[in-house]
Amino acid sequence: AEVVVGFGGYVSTPAYLAARQRRIPIVVHEQNARAGLANRVGARMTPFVATTFRGTVLPHASVLGMPLRREVSQLDRAARRDEGMTAFGLDPQWPTILVTGGSLGAQRLNTSFASRAAELSAAGLQVLHVTGAGKEFEPERPDIGAPYVVVPYADRMELAYAAADLVVCRSGANTVCELTAVGLPAVYVPLPIGNGEQRFNAAVVLAAGGGLLVEDAAFTPEWITDNVVPLAGDGERLFAMGSAAASVGQRDADDALADMVHRAYASRPAPRADAVGGQGGSA
């Protein structure tokens, strides 16, 4: 290896230690707002340290953001709105709420929204609900009203984002970064486990006014009625929140991280004279 790039987790620590022993440049990228142990160790070994969020405490850190798929980072939501509507069988006349708990789904979101499907449709609020595989349900809705579309997963999330006016979701680092990159307002419901990193991940966009946060236990059907319904129907407020979200979003983190890797590569120490001589003698 000529550069070791680590993103944290238990496998990164031995890689960082081996790279330091072999004088191989190290690049550390911390995805979450609160740095994990492996990256706290790795950041002490290199000047090439990248964070996703402002406020993450690591030595030598530069805020680069989260590298995202180009389909998301370069998304023009307005230009692709009709395509997104068609892809999911939605009706462009209605405001659209995207509900997603990630690839595995989120039981709290699924059950709370399922119990309010008829109310949302009657209120003229269209829902695209990504439940997670095996967690689909048949929504109850009135004969006349906005569609409520349930899918187990979405392999073209950029089209779901293009169709959406508001997102209700967990606050994993990747989700927060995707939504801010494309300028979508969101209601964040942090996963209630771990060391609270999901709450910290949403802190920057919340401070900017680009989202709301509600704890998992408080996200009830009644909370949807009292908060999601009026918010989703308030186009002016959604526009302001979307602009605020976009103000903290970063669309070029992939290029910025690649540039840091190139700079790390260029910083490699010159081969030792004895190593060069030894290679020549064995040729």
Q: What is the predicted function of each stretch?
A:
Residues R237-R251:
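A short, well-ordered alpha-helix in the C-terminal region of glycosyltransferases
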Residues C169, P185-N195:
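Short hydrophobic beta-strand element within catalytic cores of glycosyltransferases
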Residues R20-D82, A87:
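Active-site-proximal region of nucleotide-activated glycan assembly enzymes
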Residues R77-C169, V176, R199-L206, V214-W223, ...:
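Donor-nucleotide binding loops and adjacent catalytic segments primarily
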Residues A1, T46, A164:
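An anion/phosphate-binding loop that grips the pyrophosphate of nucleotide cofactors and donors
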Residues R22, A162-A164, E178-V189, A208:
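Conserved donor-binding/catalytic loop of nucleotide-activated donor transferases
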Residues Q250-A283:
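C-terminal alpha-helical cap of glycosyltransferases
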Residues V3-R22:
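An aromatic- and histidine-rich active-site surface loop
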